[in-house]
Structure formats: C-alpha cells, structure tokens
Design a protein with these regions (language model features):
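Amphipathic alpha-helical packing elements
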Residues: 1-25, 178
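Charged, low-complexity surface segments at secondary-structure and domain boundaries
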Residues: 1-5, 45, 183-184
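Conserved aromatic-histidine-acidic binding/catalytic patches
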Residues: 3-4, 93, 97-101, 168-171
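Aromatic side chains
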Residues: 6, 15-16, 35, 100-101, ...
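Class I S-adenosyl-L-methionine
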Residues: 19-121
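Conserved S-adenosyl-L-methionine
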Residues: 105-184
Length: 184
C-alpha cells in the first residue's frame, strides 16, 4: 500500500485512519473548497484510507507519484480515434452485481483503456458513477485468455495492433455519495 506493507487490511486501515485523524485537525486542510461539513468521527467512519476518504484525499498525490510516471514531452504518443460498441457485457456477472442508472459494462470500457493507455498508467475517472472504469482498468491485467483472444482477433480484423495487456491504476471520483460508495 503506497510502498508500505501491513500485517493485514485492518492494520493498514488503522494506520491511515490515524494519519487522517491528525490531518483533520489541520485548519488549512479543512479550508479546501468542497470540504464536507461532517464531523471528524463521521468522516473517519466513512473512510477507508488511503484508498477512499469522505473528504479530499490527502494521499492522491502520493498515489500518482507512486504508481504514475512523469510526463515526458519527448515520448511519442499518438492514437487514432476508437469507436466501440458499449452495449457489450450487459449480461456479465460483474455488471449485474449492482444497479446504477448510467452504468456502462466494464467489458465495453476495456478496449478504450487498452487503446489509449499502457500497462501501469494511471487512469482518471472524474465522474466514476458505478466504478466500472476501475474494474476495467484492473481487468486489463486479469482478463481471461478467452476474452483476450476474442479481442485480439477483433482488433486484428480491424487492422489494429494487438493490445498491451496489463493492469492500469484507476483514480475514481464522484460527487454523488451513492456513486462514491459503489466505486469504493
């Protein structure tokens, strides 16, 4: 977790909750635009730091520094536009796990992530809703061989190079409390 190892998830959560509790005492931290009006206890109860906080996440920059890579203006980056069918995957078990009014199946998002990013890249979804972009980012590294084969064949038929498989790291954010909890 951000370069640290913990005995278990509870130990990680307790450690970061302690750091968040200290951070909540900083008046400058609380002055940020959009900071919730909730009590410290409520913010801590709804948070699972460093992954999810019910206030501006103080570990976001550290996450990006740890998992991301600096922008290199000399690195060549060029991608053709990609048009895909976003109705694929509506019968998948992951898609059916919960309902959300604007949900797009993760299987419909995977091709876009594969096309526009490389393994290890950080993907930002500022309107994450159901969290399917996060699922898709991980799926790029864990997709079953059958799915990989089908997608590679479709891309080959369309004249595209084979995708670079490998997980991407997702940063998910949403203004909706329901969406935020689903994405977490």
């Amino acid at each position: 977790c951000l370069g640290q190892t913990f005995e278990n998830d509870s130990a990680r959560r307790l450690y970061y909750l302690g750091l968040l509790a200290k951070r909540l005492q900083d008046p400058a931290f609380r002055q940020q635009e959009g900071f919730p009006t909730g009590t410290d206890e409520a913010i801590l109860a709804m948070s699972d730091p460093p992954y999810y906080t019910a206030c501006p996440n103080p570990w976001l920059a550290e996450f990006v520094a740890h998992y991301g890579k600096p922008y290199d203006p000399s690195a060549k980056y060029s991608r053709e536009p990609l048009a895909i069918d976003v109705s694929v995957g509506k019968t998948d078990a992951i898609y059916k796990a919960h309902s959300y009014h604007t949900k797009v199946p993760h299987l419909a998002i995977v091709p876009s992530i594969l096309h526009y990013t490389n393994p290890g890249d950080v993907v930002l979804d500022g309107f994450s809703g159901s969290g399917m972009t996060g699922v898709a980012a991980q799926w790029c590294g864990t997709a079953p061989s059958g799915y990989r084969f089908e997608l590679e064949q479709a891309w080959k038929k369309a004249g595209r190079a084979a995708p670079q498989w490998g997980a991407r790291r997702a940063v998910l954010n949403d203004l909706s409390p329901a969406a935020t909890f689903i994405g977490a």
